[in-house]
Amino acid sequence: MSHSNKLVLFFEKLIFSNRILILTSLILLCAVLTFQGTQVKPEASFLKMLPTNHEFIKNFLSYKKELSNLGNVVRVVVENKNGDIFDADYQEVLKNVTDEVFFISGVNRDGLKSLWTPNVRWQEVTEEGFIGGSIIPDGYNGSKKNLDIIKSNILKSGQVGNLVSNDFKSSIILAPLQDTNPETGLPLDYHQFSKALEDNVRAKYTSENINIRIVGFAKVVGDLIDGAMQVVLFFMLAVLIVLLLLWFYSRCLRSTFAVVICSILAVFAQLGTLNIMGYGINPYSMLVPFLVFAIGVSHGVQIVNSIIHHAETGANKLDAAKLAFRSLYLAGITALISDAIGFTTLMVIDIGVIQELAIAASVGVAIIIITNLVALPIILSFIGISPKAVEYSRKNTHNISLVEKLFANFTKAPLAILTIVVSVGLFSGGLYYSQFMKIGDLDAGAPELRPDSRYNLDNAFIVENYTASTDVFVIMAETGADQCSKYNNLVLIDQLQWQLKNTAGVQDVISITDISKLGMFGMNEGSLKWVNLNRNEFVVNATLSQVPSGFINADCSMAPIIVFLNDHKADTLNTVVNTVTDFSKQYPQDGIKFLLAAGNAG
């Protein structure tokens, strides 16, 4: 007798000699894990979605604080459906929505931008010099005079296409998010954040005149988690379909329920184990329970089929269960361990959510070994297979179904030859076209959601009505301390900016050079001849004395170049990356490096 057979017989004797004790222990264990499984919560993290060891992400994380307004942000659009934004009722709603968003936990309140926040300002050159202020005038009372002032201030602020739509029918509240909830110190709960936006903003302020649109990573995740309830309904439907198919196949109700219950217990035990390990269910791993259930049913059906086969030969229910265990245990555990190892290889992908998916799948497969290869044979050794099912199997043993006859023809010439030829052709075609496989998103908006989902419709509205799109790609121009405003560095930034503006897929590009040019323009009586960079260091410093936050860091060692894209498709991103890379190679310069990449598209 081989070593493997001795091992199987050892486990068979161990399990079936102590089947009451083992089954009781497994029931108690599954009860504990099932309770833990009911406590598992949906979770998502912005950083877990990123390959944190990738060069681009390392560059972003090194300047994460300085670029907080350009990474994980939410845009809330307040649209006037029956007019424009220069309306007293609209401005009242915009003010209230701004306040609502401001007080939602997780919003970085220092970086919040709206027409009603003091960090959004206008500036003008007059005979007396520079004047400026907030968009909303002091003492605002909703009068036509005040609304005219707001219109004038918006036109002077440069926010048209950015915070204000090109048709003046809507405006944006830009809310950068924190990684943690400041009230609890825990990672930001995107589901609760998304729910707060829906309850406190969209549901509260949407009316016959006002439409609220919301986009951003947090909203995508929130919508995906909301969809988890639909996933539960689909799971219940899958269970029902499997019940019907198993009964139709075996004609044994008790074994059908045994297989399905063991597979469901595997799912709950998996969720419970993940909860004990400190993991939750993220939008990418919420479909793993389907996988665990499917694998469990697959192995369960094989066990039931084997028990029926042995019962046909006259074996009693205990002996039939033992023989089925003996014939399938080694093959089953080998297959499941292979599955677990296969899922574990996903750990090499350096993205948190993918690694958690690998852990979830591997844990689920490991638990199937207990619930379906150990517990199920024990259960069937007690309840057995119904005589009706055994008789049904015996009658159909020699009956060949139409489907079997159809596929059997493929083992004979000429269909066998045709099958091989077609297979080789499909393989060759697949091999050829695989070289054109795109990495990344192929459609605009959030590919995780349907094209006609509310989120993607909201995103399409912003792309259509705003110059500054929701897809932002940021290049970090890194210099020495106090060197980002040096003339030579500004010239290189300006040249790269010009090339990017003339790159397919780019809507607009802004950087510190735009601020400096506008400063020169303003300091020289608004003469268009002076819209340029100045070689004099003191003049440059003067032009940047009022630089808005986010255009340089504290010690002027990094200046972001902000690129607004048409979309975040793979082709668009590759084009932008190649433009920056080629520029860096063509114009190497000591003292400045163009680092990729930040922003939600970076």
Task: Describe the predicted segments one by one.
Residues 2-42, 378, 392-443, 457-460:
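Signature of alpha-helical transmembrane segments and their immediate interfacial
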Residues 92, 96-172, 177, 189-193, ...:
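Alpha-helical transmembrane helix bundles of large polytopic membrane transport and channel proteins
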Residues 276, 293-305, 329-348, 353-395:
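Transmembrane alpha-helices and their membrane-interface boundaries in multi-pass membrane transporters
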Residues 310-337:
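Helix-loop junctions and hydrophobic alpha-helical segments within the transmembrane domains
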Residues 408-410, 414-534:
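Juxtamembrane segments of multi-pass membrane proteins
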